[in-house]
């Protein structure tokens, strides 16, 4: 059932991300080293950890579907923490909104006639879906709406599968690079440290792009590797993709730390659980929580160091 026939969109989410991405000054950022190939990134030592790429593939299998003449929703794998949707109309400006049980609304641009993957980041519960076509300016009309109530049994699914913002496949150069970087790792923390070190020393901040990027921008992780530069969203997408391909559940989060816009990555580590803000971008620099501390501290001490979450106010999770 349609909730509203006409809505007005503002680019609040992208403004939050892009405001963050355009912060900082060139003199605060060291020059990046030249990107290495995945083969060059490999070390002689072979670690104890299995570094075989683990790339989950979302499926629009057609078991459970909904739709109309312009929109198709595949809800066959809600239990895995994602849904798939495609727009088959002729309008060139189409928005998709997904509101979860926490009442946070995610707004996406629909960019393809193929099925695209969207994570159910708010967990199990009622989700409202709505697709809107542009009428004029910022005015959009509802062309499809639907309520779904997924029971997500694979709670790591939303943070292991690719999606619009974190897009990778087994053939991605970034996935091959992650496997090479992880070859010498003994545990997940070694992989996190290796990925962080590589990306922050081989990718430089693109100030020109930060000033000109438009609403609807989606990262291209292999493009970031090839160019050796990107904005904070490119950094985050690249690192999350690499870690997920190594079977490390990782969240890309955007929100506030205190009064400041921040982007941070949180990863799930055995014995410690979710480590919030293991990598963080403050508008100028990326920083990494000391992995030695995380590895050697008790769960209680680690949680005390990280805090109870009150310092972080997450707005969106991808």
Where are these regions (language model features)?
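Hydrophobic/aromatic-rich core segments of domains that either
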Residues: 234-318
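N-terminal accessory/pre-domain segments preceding catalytic cores
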Residues: 2-187, 274-275, 311-318
